[in-house]
A protein has these predicted regions:
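Residue-level detector of the short coil/turn that links helix A to helix B
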Residues: 6, 46, 87-88, 133, ...
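Amphipathic alpha-helical segments of tetratricopeptide repeats
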Residues: 19-20, 59-63, 98-108, 146-153, ...
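TPR/TPR-like (Sel1-like) alpha-helical repeat modules
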Residues: 232-236, 271-287
């Protein structure tokens, strides 16, 4: 057993004893806090059923209480929302809406969350909501995350700002706000390029996605040249990652070369298309010889 697991197991034993005692003669506040803490420990240990039981018991207990600490309130709904995501989307949405109802009370560190923890909570909830097409509901979380990082310029914060701008772009696209999405992706690219150029970017694929998604919007708006530029910028990064053996899956690299070649051929840009087709061949993509033959017939 890892040392971290041993620590969690010891903490679990202590909370089992504490909750047993509090159920006899503790206050509701004390019992609620202990249940939320044990739920978190169980979740970290992978005991999701038991963790869910504690989270649900905490939520039911809180409903009869006049005042619930903001940190404890957020934590119990976040815990259950995270665990229920795959099985009960509506309950997850309901739990996250409860968090939204108290986001305005958060201006800095609270119980269960330091500053970084709050930002990660907001980012995680936004990601979950976007994944199930609840785009509008993600907005309070991304806004709160950016508000908390308003004056931050450290490397960690700049990486989070880039990622959150990508989430905003996805949500705006989902809501049909393409111009807003372009602004969000452009901000992500501005931050991401600065991080990438100074080797401080944590996940270069986030920058790739910003270029790809902005390019996709440009293509939908018939700004083909701008799409080509964005997708080729994404390819520069992917090729560099591939050359350094840091690209675990070349699928996106291959697809971008193929799609650019196809788009350029349709526009009569044969020489530019050939470059991408030849690269696709070098990457071992089947069927590219036929595409080359078709391109040559168009000369």
């Amino acid at each position: 057993m890892r040392a971290s697991d041993e620590h969690l197991e010891q903490a679990l034993k202590e909370y089992n004893d504490k909750i047993s005692a509090l159920e006899v003669n503790g206050t509701d506040d004390e019992l609620l806090e202990a249940l939320v803490n044990r739920s978190t420990i169980l979740m970290l240990l992978g005991s999701y059923t038991a963790s869910m039981t504690d989270a649900e018991e905490a939520i039911e207990l809180s409903k009869g209480m006049k005042d619930v600490d903001i940190g404890t309130f957020v934590k119990m709904y976040e815990n259950r929302g995270q665990m229920i995501f795959d099985d009960n989307e509506e309950m997850m949405v309901s739990d996250y809406s409860m968090i939204i109802s108290r986001l305005d009370e958060i201006h800095g560190e609270i119980r269960h969350y330091d500053w970084k923890g709050l930002i990660m909570m907001c980012q995680g909830c936004a990601e979950d909501l976007i994944d199930c097409d609840r785009f509008e509901m993600s907005v309070p979380f991304t806004q709160k995350a950016l508000e908390l990082m308003k004056d931050a310029s450290d490397i960690w914060s700049m990486n989070r700002k880039m990622e959150i701008q990508n989430l905003i772009g996805q949500a705006d696209t989902g809501m049909g706000l393409d111009n807003n999405a372009i602004d969000a992706y452009s901000e992500s690219i501005l931050i991401g390029e600065q991080l990438y150029d100074t080797s401080r970017i944590e996940d270069p694929i986030q920058l790739v996605f910003a270029y790809v998604y902005r390019g996709d919007i440009m293509e939908a708006e018939h700004e083909v040249e701008k799409m080509w530029n964005d997708h080729e910028s994404a390819l520069v990064i992917l090729e560099e990652l591939n050359n350094r053996n840091r690209l675990s899956d070349p699928d996106l690299l291959i697809k971008l070369h193929q799609s650019l070649a196809s788009s350029m051929m349709e526009s009569g840009e044969i020489e530019r298309a050939e470059k991408h087709l030849m690269r696709a061949i070098n990457l071992g993509v089947p069927g590219m010889k036929d595409a080359i033959d078709e391109m040559n017939s168009m000369r």
